[in-house]
Amino acid sequence: MKRILTVAIIVLSSYLQARAQEKMKPEETEIYSPVPVKVKPGAAFRDAPSDAIILFDGKNLDQWVNTKDSSAASWIVSDNAMTVNKATGDIQTRQLFTDYQLHIEYRIPSNITGSGQARGNSGIFLASLPWGPGGYELQVLDNYDNATYVNGQAGSMYKQAIPLVNACLKPGEWQTYDVIWTAPRFSEAGLLKSLASVTVFHNGVLVQNNTTLLGDTPYIGQPAYRKHGAAPIKLQAHGDKSEPISYRNIWVRTL
């Protein structure tokens, strides 16, 4: 009964928040303290296990499409990595997923410029949705020596969950995210039955520990849930002017 009541409260809260979001400013959902402690990660990359679905092996983008029109993904493939093409926008997987384990590696270029949110910004949307903020975003950003609001730094679930620590490596080094994603569940009528949850290891260090989400991850306003099923995984081409980042060695295991 307590769980049902909690979910009902969240549903009502999501509705009321959605009505108020248009009047909010981005700064109203930015948190600047406490700042997560920096830790130094170990060095290790993980090969895909035998039951993994390979989403990117460094050769082509066959498993990806452009988000805006579902055409063939047009990011740049070179040296076993894909680099964001900011001119063509986000890309997402052809395949849809519900619950899964994800491994992905990314690199902020060594010549990165900019500051705050305009420095190596990208994002991994653990379920890409065609409305609102576009889903549930795990932030990608250079925060090795770059301050920003802490619920928007690398390792955060954007504007919703601050990372436990700052495990960022220097620009120019390959970094890893290992994610366990459990999608939200909805009734046939669209009522929320269970919240989304996520566990994230950043460069082998725990930064999100079975974190439950109150909804999607908007830039402006409060999170909200809306009924959806299985969804693609999306990589963001952020509109900031800093040099584009790269990804490699992406695989997923369905759970």
Regions found by a protein language model. Give the residues of each.
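Bacterial Sec-dependent N-terminal signal peptides
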Residues: 1-21
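Carbohydrate-interacting regions of secretory-pathway proteins
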Residues: 20-255
